[in-house]
Design a protein with these regions (language model features):
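Protein-protein interaction/assembly regions in multi-subunit complexes
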Residues: 49-53
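A preference for well-ordered globular domain cores
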Residues: 1-19, 26-45, 55-220
Length: 220
């Protein structure tokens, strides 16, 4: 989805008759309006770029989320933006709604989005950042154990077109450490979600720092 351009900072939510316009991920940029042609000095102007969706009534979390999914955003992003937009509209008096529940839905989706990002799902091997999901880890464990059983002393692992040579024992040790790391991250994510559900104040939920407490990235 391409961002739309505005000459002024757009409101995050706005009613256009019976349609709710939602602007998000807004950024301010300097746009070149000439290239110093004909002896002129280069000039720029401030513009705002934002993703824009428009949703017809009823303005429910489900409907707004569906509109975002249709535009290609993933589920966590869609729910987070939908809940935040409806919460903003509620706080501005534009729409009714359960502010507390919307705040919880927003933060829980953000936590899930963060948990799935490189901020959590990343380690480095020989200074190369990478990640192995659980299915891949399990497959590698089976492979390395099999290679160890038949007496192989080295194994070649691939990340795209890049290869890494490692001994089966070192590979199994790496995967064990990675499994512990992934488990600790899972526990921390669950802890944050539980904390959000327990909060009964919208401002406290909105200001909750769900990035805290995760283990440091592993380096091998």
């Amino acid at each position: 989805m391409k961002k739309s351009e505005f000459t002024e900072n757009p409101a995050p939510v706005e009613l256009e008759g019976t349609v709710l316009r939602i602007c998000f991920d807004t950024e301010e940029v300097d746009q070149v309006i000439n290239n110093g042609e004909e002896g002129q000095e280069p000039a720029t102007r401030k513009v705002y770029l934002a993703y824009v969706i428009r949703v017809n009534n009823p303005f429910t979390l489900e409907n707004v989320t569906k509109a975002l999914l249709k535009e290609g955003f993933d589920e966590f992003k869609a729910v987070a933006v939908a809940a935040e937009s409806l919460l903003t509209a509620n706080e501005a008096g534009l729409l009714p709604g359960n502010a507390l529940e919307l705040a919880r839905q927003m933060q829980i989706a953000r936590i899930s989005e963060y948990d799935a990002s490189d901020a959590v799902n990343q380690f480095s091997f020989d200074d190369v950042p990478m990640w192995l999901d659980k299915d891949t880890r399990n497959g590698l464990i089976a492979r390395l154990n099999a290679e160890k059983a038949v007496g192989k002393t080295t194994s070649t692992l691939w990340l795209g077109t890049q290869s890494f040579t490692i001994t089966p024992d070192a590979g199994l040790q790496l995967l064990s450490a990675l499994e512990v790391y992934a488990s600790e991250c899972y526990d921390k994510t669950a802890e944050h979600k539980t904390a959000i559900v327990a909060l009964n104040d919208v401002d406290a939920i909105k200001s909750y720092d769900f990035t805290q407490g995760y283990p440091a990235h592993l380096e091998f």
